[in-house]
C-alpha cells in the first residue's frame, strides 16, 4: 500500500450486463442429493476455473437527506446530458481483456455530438457500443480520442439521430473544484439506469490511484470525495450546484470505504477544444512518472531550506512537490534523472503541479526542455528531448496462429519500469497459449530469430510453414528475471490468416488487412526412437507395457458440445501398432474438430485423426501413420475376461509429471456408475458403465494408465472422466476410474478389421436397483431368484432413470419406448444384470424388452438409436455465438428439443455476450421466421444488414420462451461455419460469410477465434488448462 492507501483501489466499471438478466438454465445439480440406488463416484479430482468477470462490490448507503430546491433544479438539467454506455472491447488489447460492460458518460458538445467518459470505457482496443439517453433514445457511438495516460476518452454520436430529446451539454469547469464543495455524482451506478450520489470534496492533491495490474492513471493529481459510487459509475460527471462538471468519476475503494476518486477536467477540456478545432491532441513525455510528495518527505530526499522557502513563498497554498518515481530505461530521461529527484523548475519556471507540467510537455513534442531538480541537496540541471506519447502507445495489433500481439505499451512499461520495446502477447491463445496465462508475455525470439518489435515478429512468422514446431523464448512481464523456452506448434490451418488491425480514428473502427497467406506444411519425415527402460521394477509385465503407451495432445480451435477446454493432454494405449490405433479417454479427445498429436517414446511426434468416438463409455480411438514411427511400439494385449473384485493386479499409470509409476495392488470394488450431469451446461459424460477402483494411492494421482496382469495382458484401462462443475466454486470434477478391456473389444476388433463401427444404442440412462427395492417395485420372487443365480457377485437389476430426447425424425409411441421408472428384466430374452449385457443393443434395430412398469410385467418393442447422428458435424459462428445441433449430452438431459439451433458457447466482447444470448439456449425464430435447423437460420440471418437490430426468439433449457434483440456486427464478428468434410486434410472445412471480403459472401476462410475467450456455460468463466488438485487415498464410489 502506498501513502494514499491504493492497495484497495478499484475502477468503477459495471459487471452487470444483459447476460446476467436471464440465466440460461436452472438444472438442479446432481451432486447434492442422489436418487436412491444411484451410484456416482464420490471423490473426484477438482481443478480450478478462473472467473473473468469483475466483481461489483455493492456498498450499503445510508438514506441521503432531501436535496434543496437548488440542487433539484440542477439535477433535472444535468440528467438530460448523462448517458448510459453499453460497450464491448471485442478482443483483448494492452491492459484489457475482451469484455462487455456498462458505464456512464455525459454530453460535452451537443452540436458536434461529443461525449466525455473514462479511458478504460473507450478502451485501448477495438470498441463497439451504444449509448442510451435519459428519455431512452439509443444511438451508436464511436471513439474519437482515448488518452494514452489519463483516464478519459471522448466518444462521438450523431446528434441528428436523437429526435425526441433536446440535447444539452455540461460545461467543463475544472477550476470550480474546491475542498469542501458539495457535489453530486450522476451516473449509471451499479448497472442501474440512473443513480444520484452525493458527497463533499475532501482533497484536491491526491496522487492517482494504482489499480494494480492493468491500466492505471499517473502523472496527474486526483480529487477525493466520499460518494460511495459502485460499478457502472465510471465516466459519471461530478457536478456542483451550478450544474457544471468539475471532475470525472474514475475509481474508488473496494474495501467498503465510501471513498471515490475523480479526475480533474483540465486535460479533458484541452483535448476537447483541440478536437473541436480539428487539431491533433499532442501529448509529450520524457517517460518519467512523477508523484506528489509532501514537504516533509521532500526534505528527507534532500530539498534544501532555501528552495523550500522559495516554493512556499511563490505558492503559499502548496504542501507538496513533484518527485521522480519511475524513469524508464532507454527513455529520454534515462541516465539523466534519478528516482527521488525533486523537481524545481522546467524551462526556468518554478513548478509544483502536474497540470502545468503536462502543459509544457504537450506543447514541446520533438523539442528539448530544461529541468532543474534537487538530488540529495544538490542542484542538477539537465535537458531532455520530449517524445511523442502517442508513438509509444500501440494503435495496431497482429493476429496469427490464434494469438494476438502488439508492441509493448507505455502503460505496461511504466508499471514494471522497463523499456518501451518488445512484442507483447495480449491474447495468449492458439499456438501461443503459454503456461496457462491469458496475457502478459514478451516474445524475445521465435525459431531462433530475435523479435525485438512487431515488424520483426511478423517477418519471422511469415516464413514459418503450417504445422511446424519452433522454439520460442519468452518472459512474463511480471517476472522478467525468468526466461522461458517452449516448443510451439504453429497452427495456420484453423487460423489461416495473419491479420493486421490498425486503429482508424476517423471511423472509430479498426481496419483489418491480410499480411500473408500460410505456407503449406512440410511433408512429415520418419523418425527413429527407443522407449525408456524401467529401472528397479520387479514386474516384467510393467516393463513391457511401456512400449504400448503414447502421449496424446488434443487442441480444439472451437468450443463445441459444452466441453470447457481448448487443449488437453494425456496418455493413450496402442491397441494395434501396425495400423497405429490408439485408445484414449474421451475426456482428452472429446470431438473430432481438433488437432491430435501423438508422441511416441517421448521422441517422435506425429499427427493423428479420430477414428471412433464411443457415445457412452468415455473412450476415443485415434489413428496415426505408423510408417512415420521407427520405434519398437508394441500392441497391447487386451484381456477377454472381466477382472474381478479382490483380484491382484499391477497398476501402471502416468503422474502429473508425465512419469510412469508402478504399484502392485488389488481391485477394491467394481460398481455400476454414471458420471453426474453438469448443471450449468450439458457436456459429454460416461453413463451405464462398470467402474473399477484399486487399493493404491497412485490411482488418484494418475489420470491415465492400465491394470495389467502378471502375464502382461491388460485387464483394464485407467481413464479420466470429466464430471460436473460445482455451482459454488466453479470447479470441474474429474474422476479417475478403471474400465475393463472386454467392454472395449466389440468396437476395437471392428476398427482393427478396417470396419467403421455403426453402433446402435438404447436412448436411455439407467441405474442399479437392489433386490429390496425391486421387490417393492413389483418384481416377482421368481425373477429375484433368477437374478441371484445369474449374477452371484452382484444381485442387481437396472431401472430407467432418464429417457433421452430422440433425434429429429425419430418417433416412438409411449407403448414401444422406455419410461422413467421401468425396471429392465430381459432384452431379447437375455436376463440383464450386468452393464456388459447391454451390449446386445449395438447391432439390433429393435429389442424385445421384458420390463416391470407400475408393478406390472409387460413386453415392449424398444427401437435403438443410430449413433452416427449423435456426433457434431457442423457449427455456425454468428455474432460471437457458436451454434450447433443439440449434441448427445443435451438430449440426455432435456425432455424436448425446441429446435436444432443450439447455443453451445459465446465469445467475450461479442454481440451474443452483450445482449445476453447465453449458452444452452435454443433459437427458434429470426425476425418472426421459424428456424428449425441451421440451414434456415443461416439463410435468415444472411438477409440482415450489418449494424442492424434483429429479433431472435429463443427458449431456455428450462422451456422458458423469450425474445432477445441483437445488433449484427459483421466487421468484428463475421459469420463463419465449420463443416465436417472427410475429404478435407483436417477433416473439417471452414466457410466464411464475410461479405466485406468476399463478393458472394461465401469463401473458404476462418475467423481468428479464441476458444479460451469463450464460455460454454452461463456462469461466465474463462477456462484455463487445469492444474489437478491431487486427492490422496483411495477412490471410492457410492
Swiss-Prot record:
Region (Serine protease): 82-275
Keywords on record: Apoptosis, Hydrolase, Nucleus, Protease, Repeat, Serine protease
Polar residues composition-biased segments: 30-43
GO molecular function, one term: serine-type endopeptidase activity
Function: Nuclear serine protease which mediates apoptosis.
Protein name: Pro-apoptotic serine protease nma111
Cellular component terms per the entry's GO annotation: nucleus
UniProt feature coiled coil, ranges: none
Cellular localisation: Nucleus
Homology family: Belongs to the peptidase S1C family.
Pfam family, one: Trypsin_2
Region (Disordered): 1-47
Active site: 120 (charge relay system), 151 (charge relay system), 233 (charge relay system)
Keyword match Repeat: yes
Signal peptide: none
EC number(s) reported in the record: 3.4.21.-
InterPro entries: PDZ, PDZ-like_dom, PDZ_6, PDZ_sf, Peptidase_S1_PA, Peptidase_S1C
Amino acid at each position: 500500500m502506498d501513502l494514499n492507501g491504493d492497495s484497495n483501489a478499484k475502477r468503477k466499471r459495471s459487471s452487470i450486463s444483459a447476460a446476467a438478466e436471464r440465466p440460461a438454465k436452472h438444472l438442479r445439480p446432481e451432486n447434492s442429493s442422489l436418487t436412491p440406488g444411484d451410484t456416482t463416484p464420490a471423490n473426484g479430482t477438482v481443478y480450478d476455473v478462473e472467473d473473468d468477470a469483475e466483481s461489483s462490490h455493492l456498498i450499503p448507503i445510508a438514506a441521503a437527506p432531501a436535496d434543496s430546491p437548488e440542487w433539484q433544479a440542477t439535477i433535472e438539467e444535468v440528467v438530460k446530458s448523462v448517458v448510459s454506455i453499453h460497450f464491448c472491447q471485442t478482443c483483448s488489447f494492452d491492459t484489457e481483456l475482451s469484455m462487455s460492460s456498462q458505464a456512464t458518460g455525459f454530453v460535452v458538445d451537443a452540436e458536434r455530438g461529443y461525449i466525455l467518459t473514462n479511458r478504460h470505457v473507450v478502451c485501448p482496443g477495438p470498441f463497439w457500443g451504444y449509448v442510451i439517453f435519459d428519455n431512452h433514445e439509443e444511438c451508436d457511438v464511436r471513439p474519437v480520442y482515448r488518452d494514452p495516460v489519463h483516464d478519459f476518452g471522448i466518444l462521438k454520436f450523431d446528434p441528428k439521430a436523437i429526435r425526441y430529446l433536446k440535447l444539452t451539454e455540461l460545461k467543463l469547469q475544472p477550476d470550480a473544484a474546491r475542498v469542501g464543495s458539495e457535489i453530486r455524482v450522476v451516473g449509471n451506478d451499479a448497472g442501474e439506469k440512473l443513480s444520484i450520489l452525493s458527497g463533499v470534496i475532501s482533497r484536491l492533491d491526491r496522487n492517482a490511484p494504482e489499480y494494480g495490474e492493468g491500466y492505471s492513471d499517473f502523472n496527474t493529481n486526483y480529487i477525493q470525495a466520499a460518494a460511495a459510487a459502485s460499478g457502472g459509475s465510471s465516466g459519471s460527471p461530478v457536478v456542483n450546484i451550478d450544474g457544471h462538471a468539475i471532475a470525472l468519476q474514475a475509481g474508488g475503494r473496494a474495501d467498503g470505504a465510501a471513498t471515490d476518486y475523480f479526475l480533474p477536467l483540465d486535460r479533458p477540456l484541452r483535448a476537447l477544444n483541440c478536437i473541436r478545432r480539428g487539431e491533433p491532441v499532442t501529448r509529450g513525455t520524457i517517460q518519467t512518472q512523477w508523484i506528489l510528495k509532501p514537504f516533509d518527505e521532500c526534505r528527507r530526499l534532500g530539498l534544501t531550506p532555501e528552495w523550500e522557502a522559495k516554493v512556499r513563498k511563490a505558492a503559499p497554498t502548496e504542501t507538496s512537490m513533484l518527485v521522480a518515481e519511475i524513469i524508464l530505461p532507454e527513455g529520454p530521461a534515462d541516465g539523466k534523472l534519478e528516482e527521488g529527484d525533486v523537481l524545481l523548475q522546467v524551462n526556468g519556471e518554478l513548478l509544483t503541479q502536474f497540470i502545468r507540467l503536462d502543459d509544457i510537455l504537450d506543447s514541446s513534442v520533438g523539442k528539448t526542455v530544461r529541468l532543474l531538480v534537487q538530488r540529495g541537496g544538490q542542484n542538477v540541471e539537465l535537458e531532455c528531448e520530449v517524445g511523442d506519447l502517442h508513438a509509444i502507445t500501440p494503435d495496431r495489433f497482429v493476429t496469427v496462429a490464434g494469438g494476438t500481439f502488439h508492441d509493448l505499451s507505455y502503460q505496461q512499461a511504466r508499471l514494471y519500469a522497463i523499456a518501451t520495446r518488445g512484442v507483447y502477447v495480449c491474447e495468449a491463445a492458439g499456438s501461443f497459449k503459454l503456461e496457462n496465462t491469458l496475457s502478459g508475455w514478451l516474445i524475445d525470439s521465435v525459431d531462433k530469430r530475435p523479435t525485438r518489435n512487431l515488424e520483426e515478429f511478423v517477418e519471422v512468422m511469415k516464413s514459418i510453414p503450417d504445422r511446424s514446431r519452433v522454439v520460442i523464448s519468452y518472459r512474463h512481464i511480471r517476472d522478467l528475471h525468468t526466461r522461458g523456452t517452449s516448443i510451439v506448434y504453429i497452427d495456420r490451418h484453423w487460423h489461416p490468416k495473419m491479420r493486421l488491425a490498425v486503429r482508424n480514428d476517423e471511423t472509430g473502427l479498426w481496419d483489418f488487412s491480410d499480411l500473408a497467406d500460410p505456407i503449406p506444411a512440410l511433408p512429415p519425415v520418419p523418425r527413429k526412437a527407443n522407449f525408456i527402460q524401467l529401472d528397479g521394477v520387479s514386474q516384467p509385465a510393467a516393463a513391457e507395457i511401456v512400449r504400448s503407451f503414447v502421449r496424446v495432445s488434443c487442441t480444439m480451435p472451437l468450443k463445441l458440445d459444452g466441453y470447457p477446454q481448448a487443449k488437453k493432454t494425456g496418455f493413450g494405449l496402442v491397441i494395434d501398432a501396425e495400423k497405429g490405433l490408439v485408445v484414449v479417454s474421451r475426456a482428452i479427445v472429446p470431438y473430432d474438430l481438433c488437432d491430435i498429436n501423438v508422441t511416441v517414446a517421448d521422441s517422435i511426434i506425429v499427427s493423428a485423426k479420430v477414428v471412433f468416438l464411443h457415445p457412452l463409455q468415455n473412450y476415443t480411438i485415434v489413428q496415426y501413420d505408423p510408417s512415420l514411427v521407427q520405434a519398437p511400439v508394441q500392441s497391447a494385449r487386451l484381456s477377454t475376461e472381466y477382472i474381478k473384485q479382490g483380484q491382484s493386479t499391477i497398476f501402471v499409470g502416468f503422474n502429473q509429471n508425465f512419469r510412469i509409476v508402478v504399484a502392485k495392488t488389488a481391485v477394491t470394488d467394481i460398481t455400476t456408475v454414471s458420471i453426474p450431469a453438469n448443471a450449468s451446461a450439458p457436456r459429454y459424460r460416461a453413463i451405464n458403465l462398470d467402474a473399477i477402483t484399486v487399493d493404491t494411492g497412485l490411482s488418484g494421482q494418475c489420470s491415465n494408465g492400465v491394470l495389467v496382469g502378471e502375464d502382461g495382458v491388460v485387464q483394464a484401462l485407467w481413464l479420466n472422466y470429466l464430471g460436473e462443475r460445482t455451482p459454488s466454486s466453479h470447479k470441474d470434477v474429474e474422476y479417475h476410474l478403471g474400465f475393463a478391456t472386454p467392454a472395449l473389444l466389440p468396437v476395437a476388433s471392428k476398427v482393427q478389421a478396417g470396419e467403421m463401427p455403426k453402433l446402435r444404442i438404447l436412448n436411455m440412462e439407467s441405474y442399479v436397483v437392489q433386490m429390496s427395492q425391486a421387490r417393492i417395485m413389483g418384481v416377482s420372487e421368481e425373477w429375484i431368484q433368477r437374478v441371484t443365480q445369474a449374477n452371484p457377485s452382484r444381485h442387481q437389476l437396472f431401472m430407467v432413470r432418464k429417457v433421452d430426447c430422440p433425434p429429429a425424425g425419430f418417433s416412438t409411441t409411449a407403448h414401444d419406448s422406455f419410461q422413467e421408472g421401468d425396471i429392465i428384466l430381459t432384452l431379447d430374452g437375455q436376463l440383464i444384470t450386468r452393464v456388459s449385457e447391454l451390449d446386445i443393443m449395438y447391432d439390433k434395430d429393435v429389442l424385445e424388452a421384458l420390463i416391470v412398469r407400475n408393478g406390472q410385467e409387460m413386453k415392449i418393442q424398444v427401437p435403438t438409436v443410430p449413433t452416427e447422428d449423435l456426433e457434431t458435424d457442423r457449427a455456425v459462428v454468428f455474432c460471437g455465438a457458436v451454434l450447433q445441433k443439440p449434441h448427445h449430452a443435451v438430449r440426455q438431459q432435456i425432455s424436448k428439443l425446441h429446435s436444432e439451433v443450439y447455443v453451445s458457447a459465446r465469445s467475450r466482447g461479442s454481440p451474443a455476450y452483450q445482449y445476453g444470448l447465453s449458452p444452452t439456449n435454443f433459437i427458434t425464430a429470426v425476425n418472426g421466421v421459424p428456424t428449425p435447423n441451421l440451414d434456415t437460420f443461416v439463410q435468415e440471418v444472411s438477409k440482415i444488414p450489418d449494424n442492424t437490430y434483429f429479433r431472435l426468439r429463443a427458449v431456455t433449457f428450462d422451456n422458458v420462451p423469450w425474445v432477445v434483440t441483437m445488433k449484427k456486427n459483421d466487421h468484428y464478428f463475421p459469420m463463419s461455419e465449420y463443416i465436417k468434410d472427410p475429404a478435407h486434410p483436417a477433416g473439417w472445412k471452414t466457410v466464411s460469410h464475410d461479405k466485406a471480403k468476399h463478393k458472394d459472401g461465401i469463401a473458404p476462410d476462418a475467423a481468428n477465434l479464441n476458444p479460451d475467450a469463450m464460455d460454454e456455460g452461463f456462469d461466465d468463466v474463462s477456462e484455463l488448462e487445469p492444474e489437478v488438485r491431487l486427492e490422496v487415498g483411495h477412490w471410492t464410489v457410492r
